[in-house]
Amino acid sequence: MSTIEKHTQIVKKTASKLGFDYCGIAEATFLEEEAPKLENWLNKNYHGKMAYMANHFDKRLDPRKLVEGAKSVVSLMFNYYPQQNLDESRNALKIAKYAYGEDYHFVIKDKLKEFLKCLKEEIGEVHGRVFVDSAPVMERQWAVKAGLGWKGKNSLLLNKSSGSFFFLAELIIDLPLIYDNPSDKDYCGTCTRCVDACPTDAILQDNLIDGSKCISYLTIELKEAIPDDFKGKMENWVFGCDICQDVCPWNRFSKPHKEEAFLPHADLEKSAWEEMTKETFNKVFKRSALKRTKWEGFQRNIHFVKNEAS
């Protein structure tokens, strides 16, 4: 076995040992085909008020600008599909499944740090950085290049065996490895279930999302008042949205995760969120992704969906 084969085997085994469901590897190169797509998306203001999306254009397209001497992008998938959904009846306030438990940034980042540590212990001098939705990395595009799946019409990564309820993460390292074949087939075909189900018409042609219309954007990223145009369209989502994933036929293959940290927080079972004080919110959701919207944003979302129903 060659050194490069041995190193690749160590990477794949370490990913499995740390609980990652899928691991693929791509060469760290410039994403030339993505440059015009990203530029077009930004020029059409599909990023809404997310000004940071226009920053670090070159770094988004070239991992070697993030990690000096980068040779490989290790793409990872970690399942978060719950054992049981929280109350999603018609009048229940709803939050995205990824926010049921602890903040994935903390949980996955800890695993990634351990990953890099393991590589250094087994291989020796390995330099790199770890990423989980926290830097200008085009994670879905890298996952496709690493053979983990294809980009669906809802722009999410779809895996033929397991669907889309996964966190994506990356290690960008200066270690040459054996690269996986990229996914070159789109298995969505003529299906338009996600497009048809989106209540705000955020899903466009060519696997594009108008982020400024997406319920996840409106309830998390948007810091000002939610425009009245969206009244009657939120379907009681107060943090994120899973509609386009819930209707996707590929998610019939989703299996419950085994990560204790992602089990629902006890207070998520309660329905009196609109009466929650700022102090209680900060205490209860200290390690939750819900804190991203802050108490003020959470209350804004609740009042918006409550008022749109009246």
Curated annotation (Swiss-Prot):
Pathway(s) of this molecule: tRNA modification; tRNA-queuosine biosynthesis
Cofactor binding summary note: Binds 2 [4Fe-4S] clusters per monomer.
PANTHER family: EPOXYQUEUOSINE REDUCTASE (PTHR30002:SF4)
Documented EC number(s): 1.17.99.6
Protein family per UniProt: Belongs to the QueG family.
Gene: queG
Gene Ontology CC terms: cytoplasm
Any one Pfam family match given in the protein's UniProt record, by short name: QueG_DUF1730
Subcellular location: Cytoplasm
Binding site for [4Fe-4S] cluster 2: C198, C214, C241, C244
InterPro entries cross-referenced by the UniProt entry: 4Fe4S_Fe-S-bd, 4Fe4S_Fe_S_CS, QueG, QueG_DUF1730
4Fe-4S ferredoxin-type domain span: 179-208
tRNA processing is among the record's keywords: yes
Biological process, per Gene Ontology: queuosine biosynthetic process; tRNA modification
Chemical reaction(s) catalysed: epoxyqueuosine(34) in tRNA + AH2 = queuosine(34) in tRNA + A + H2O
Residues at which [4Fe-4S] cluster 1 binds: C188, C191, C194, C248
Assembly information from the UniProt record: Monomer.
Protein task: Catalyzes the conversion of epoxyqueuosine (oQ) to queuosine (Q), which is a hypermodified base found in the wobble positions of tRNA(Asp), tRNA(Asn), tRNA(His) and tRNA(Tyr).
Entry keyword set: 4Fe-4S, Cytoplasm, Iron, Iron-sulfur, Metal-binding, Oxidoreductase, Queuosine biosynthesis, tRNA processing
GO molecular function, one term: epoxyqueuosine reductase activity
Cofactors that this protein relies on: cob(II)alamin; [4Fe-4S] cluster
Top EC category: oxidoreductase
Primary subcellular site in the record, as a coarse category: cytoplasm
UniProt-recorded name of the protein: Epoxyqueuosine reductase
Record: active site: D133
